[in-house]
Amino acid sequence: MIQTIDLKKGMVFEKDGKLLKVLAINHHKPGKGNTLMQMDIQDVRSGSIVHTTMRPSEKVEQVMVNKKNAQYLYDEGNTSVFMDLETYEQYEIDQSQISEEKKYLTENMQVQMNFVDSELVGVELPATVTLEVVETQPEIKGATIDGGGKPATMNTGLVVTVPSFVKNGDKIIVNTSDGAYKSRA
């Protein structure tokens, strides 16, 4: 058992018989009273995401997650297929369970599969990924003065705010923790 104050983004825990993954966590201190933990959590089996508030002293059951190196292969209907790099065994996972990660997946990308017992419950992405810009506005002269950036759609469908010099066809490096532009590839 661990206290909710010890939970971090990406951790899996069990509460009320459900396996839950922390997607986002925020410590909130109201004007009066005790600190609260505001969290976005995902049921790893159904894929549903819920915003919840817990007391930092609440206890939850931490779940042991086993990790295996894998490669993303392809999508088939509503499932994504991954291959274990050691055994070459293929695993399928419902796309609703990896809705956030799906925005960054490209064919043959290496990831880590997360298992609880023998059940695939999610994937972990590398810290950064290289994606291709498929649609963005052309560069406007003098746009670098304000430094605001412009939206760009990647080959995976992800929309990233990029500097004004980025154009269609460019490959860029994107941070997977927050979806922010990092640099040109």
UniProtKB/Swiss-Prot annotation:
Protein location: Cytoplasm
SMART domains assigned to the protein according to its UniProt record, in alphabetical order: EFP, Elong-fact-P_C
GO terms of biological process kind: peptide biosynthetic process
Tree of life domain: Bacteria
PROSITE patterns in the record: EFP (PS01275)
Leader sequence residues: none
Similarity comment: Belongs to the elongation factor P family.
Taxonomic lineage of the native organism: Bacteria, Bacillati, Bacillota, Bacilli, Lactobacillales
Pathway assigned to this chain's UniProt record: Protein biosynthesis; polypeptide chain elongation
Gene3D superfamilies hit by this protein: 2.30.30.30, Nucleic acid-binding proteins
Matching InterPro entries: Elong-fact-P_C (IPR015365), NA-bd_OB-fold (IPR012340), Rib_uL2_dom2 (IPR014722), Transl_elong_fac_P/YeiP (IPR020599), Transl_elong_KOW-like (IPR013185), Transl_elong_P/YeiP_cen (IPR001059), Transl_elong_P/YeiP_CS (IPR013852), Transl_elongation_fac_P (IPR011768)
Main location: cytoplasm
Stated name of the protein: Elongation factor P
Alphabetical list of SUPFAM superfamilies matching this protein: Nucleic acid-binding proteins, Translation proteins SH3-like domain
UniProt function note: Involved in peptide bond synthesis. Stimulates efficient translation and peptide-bond synthesis on native or reconstituted 70S ribosomes in vitro. Probably functions indirectly by altering the affinity of the ribosome for aminoacyl-tRNA, thus increasing their reactivity as acceptors for peptidyl transferase.
Natural source organism: Limosilactobacillus fermentum (strain NBRC 3956 / LMG 18251) (Lactobacillus fermentum)
Assigned keywords, A-Z: Cytoplasm, Elongation factor, Protein biosynthesis
GO molecular function, one term: translation elongation factor activity
GO CC terms in record: cytoplasm
